[in-house]
């Protein structure tokens, strides 16, 4: 890894998506359109609700975002699974940022609640991840809680988000 800054802009996130941030074969973010945030505004390994790490990111919402045109015609809403995927993306980024090696895969979560929607008139989505635990053995496993806010109102809450980093010689779970 080149450096451990406390924030990253869009160009940095694209570099991570190209595999240029954490080294070959290690954690990568997806590239657009699946990259679900524009910037990481804060990342550390000693903050958050559990004192084990925090990562916060933002998505600028505009009515021309790709998913609004197809989900649903005449009733545009950001698919909830994309907000959830953003939280998994952030946990994987955190694991790479802390020096974890291997390719990232979402492994599940304990609980997810939606209490609102991201609609085209929303201006900004903020994602927050509070790291609960990082285990390092044959794989690197991160467990975290997260939330998503739309214009300062929390509308998604996820508990026990799980992401693993798998080295090339380790079996990567199917479907991840």
From Swiss-Prot:
What does UniProt list as catalytic? 71
Its recorded reaction(s) are: a (3R)-hydroxyacyl-[ACP] = a (2E)-enoyl-[ACP] + H2O; (3R)-hydroxydecanoyl-[ACP] = (2E)-decenoyl-[ACP] + H2O; (2E)-decenoyl-[ACP] = (3Z)-decenoyl-[ACP]
GO biological process: any one?
unsaturated fatty acid biosynthetic process
The EC number of this protein is 4.2.1.59, 5.3.3.14
Q: Which GO terms describe its molecular function?
A: (3R)-hydroxyacyl-[acyl-carrier-protein] dehydratase activity; trans-2-decenoyl-acyl-carrier-protein isomerase activity
Compartments, record wording:
Cytoplasm
Its UniProt pathway annotation is:
Lipid metabolism; fatty acid biosynthesis
Origin superkingdom: Bacteria
Q: Which GO terms describe its cellular component?
A: cytoplasm
Pfam families from the UniProt entry? FabA
**InterPro entries on file:** FabA, FabA_FabZ, HotDog_dom_sf
Q: Which residues form a coiled coil?
A: none
Keywords for this protein: Cytoplasm, Fatty acid biosynthesis, Fatty acid metabolism, Isomerase, Lipid biosynthesis, Lipid metabolism, Lyase
The signal peptide stretch is none
The entry's function note states: Necessary for the introduction of cis unsaturation into fatty acids. Catalyzes the dehydration of (3R)-3-hydroxydecanoyl-ACP to E-(2)-decenoyl-ACP and then its isomerization to Z-(3)-decenoyl-ACP. Can catalyze the dehydratase reaction for beta-hydroxyacyl-ACPs with saturated chain lengths up to 16:0, being most active on intermediate chain length.
The record's subunit annotation is: Homodimer.
Stored NCBIfam families: fabA, PRK05174.1
Q: Which family does it belong to?
A: Belongs to the thioester dehydratase family. FabA subfamily.
* Entry protein name: 3-hydroxydecanoyl-[acyl-carrier-protein] dehydratase
The protein's organism comes out as Rhodopseudomonas palustris (strain BisA53)
């Amino acid at each position: 890894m080149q450096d451990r800054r406390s924030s990253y802009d869009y160009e940095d996130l694209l570099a991570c998506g190209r595999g240029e941030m954490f080294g070959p074969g290690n954690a990568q973010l997806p590239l657009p359109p699946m990259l679900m945030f524009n910037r990481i505004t804060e990342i550390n390994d000693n903050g958050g609700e559990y004192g084990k790490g925090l990562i916060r990111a933002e998505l600028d919402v505009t009515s021309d975002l790709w998913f609004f045109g197809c989900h649903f015609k005449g009733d545009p809403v950001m698919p909830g699974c994309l907000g959830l995927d953003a939280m998994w993306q952030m946990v994987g980024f955190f694991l790479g940022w802390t020096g974890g090696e291997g390719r990232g895969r979402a492994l599940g979560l304990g609980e997810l609640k939606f209490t609102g929607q991201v609609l085209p008139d929303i201006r900004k989505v903020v994602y927050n991840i509070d790291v609960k635990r990082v285990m390092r053995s044959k794989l690197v496993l991160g467990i975290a809680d997260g939330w998503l806010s739309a214009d300062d109102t929390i509308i998604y809450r996820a508990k026990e988000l799980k992401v693993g980093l798998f080295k090339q010689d380790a079996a990567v779970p199917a479907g991840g």
